[in-house]
Structure formats: C-alpha cells, structure tokens
Amino acid sequence: MKSLLIAACLLLPCGITCAQDPVPATTTSDVAVLEPFVASYEVFRGGKSLGEATMQVVSLPARRWRVDLMMRGTRGLFAMAGVNAEQSTVFDANGETYRPLTQATVNKTVFTQKKTIGVYDWRAGSATWQGDVKESRTGPLSLQGGDMSGLLINLAVIRDAEPGRTLQYRFVDNGRVRNHRYVVADEPESVSVAGIGYTAMRVDRIEQGNEETVIWVVKGVPTPIRMLQREDGMDTYDLRLIEYKGV
C-alpha cells in the first residue's frame, strides 16, 4: 500500500523552503494559530468506498505538537486484507515554521507489518530513518531550514493557501527529498462533500508524469475538506471530510 500522501502529499501522500512564491507581506495577525483538532474522512478509490481515515493534531508538552493520519480498510478487499496505515510526525511550531522532529509510519495487513521511524536532528543538520526502509533511504540526508514531512506540508497548505498564490515546499520524508509546488486557483469554487456545501479553494500540486494531487481548502476549517490523488487520470485515493472538531 502506498505511503499516505497527501502526504507525501498527505497524502500523505509534500518544500525549496517554507516560503511561497510570490509571497505578500505577512504580519503576525495573518498567521493562522495552530490548534488541536480531530477530523474524520471516508476513503474512496475509483468512486467506491474503501474505508475510513482520521487526521488529528495533538498538543504535547514542551511546546511540541503531533500530527497523525490513520487509514483503515472497512469494505471489500481492503477490509478482508486488514489494511491499516498510520503516519505521525512530532514537530515544533514557531510562527510560520513547522519543524519536524520525529516521524513514524506503520503499514499493516492481516499477514504483514512494516514500520519506519525517522529522526530529524537539527543540531547535526541531518535526518535518518530505520526499520523497514531501503538501505538507500536510511540517510543521513542534509536538512535545510523549512524542510517538512508530507503531513506537515498538508498543514502548511491549509495555513498558506490564498487565491492565485503559488506555494513551494521541500519534502523530506521516509528517506526521500523532493521539491513540491502547489498552485491555488484564482477563484474559489463550490464543492459538496458528504452532503455539505462549501466555498473552497482548489489547490493543485504541480507534478511531472501521470500523477495528480488536488486539495480543497476552506478558510476557518483546520483540515482539507477533500484530498484527491490520481494516476493516469484515474482516482487512486479520495479522502472526503465527514466531520471535524476542536479538542
């Protein structure tokens, strides 16, 4: 099963730096305040419901935070196979900077379990991974200011999205480094998710090849209302918000 991207996206399965291009002047009052929340999603593939997902942000001691994304197969072959995937990133936040400290990924089925743990050592300026990861991806990888995991990039997109804006981030996650570029549509669009109508900003990740990632963002909602990943024009993962609440 693929890493959760919009990450990588999300999801799972997504930084250049934590700056945006172009970037209007930002004041302290413009920066969205990070707050804990729990959001529930239904997961679709090819238009068919496969399971459920939960994204949450948790406040920790010592001014640290944790963001989690958990997916569980509840229907069809995904349920029979016991598909269960989890990603977490512990991080600190200083204004507009979300700095990853540790990362964990667990993928489970009835017969298998794979786990990867990553450590972002900012004093040493490098990141390393251990567990069920290819030797070529264990690191160390050199860190740059603004580097983020895929889950943190999801939060950054929510924070930074404005109509017509271009967002650039450097993704450092699971032993890989990639530059991620997103473009926010000039005009908001009407979107219906789980029977609820929203006026949302469409954010497209600019990718090469046959992959496409789209995130829909609503002002005042701390999590994407929809996260869609496509390959060759076909939906591979589609997370649609059911509900969210502050904690």
List where the protein language model places each region.
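Positively charged n-region of N-terminal signal peptides that target proteins for export
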Residues: 1-4
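Cleavable N-terminal signal peptides
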Residues: 6-7, 17
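N-terminal signal peptide c-region/cleavage motif recognized by signal peptidases
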Residues: 13-14
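Acidic, serine/threonine-rich low-complexity disordered tracts
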Residues: 21-122, 157-247
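Hydrophobic, well-structured mid-protein blocks that either form specific transmembrane helices
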Residues: 109-152
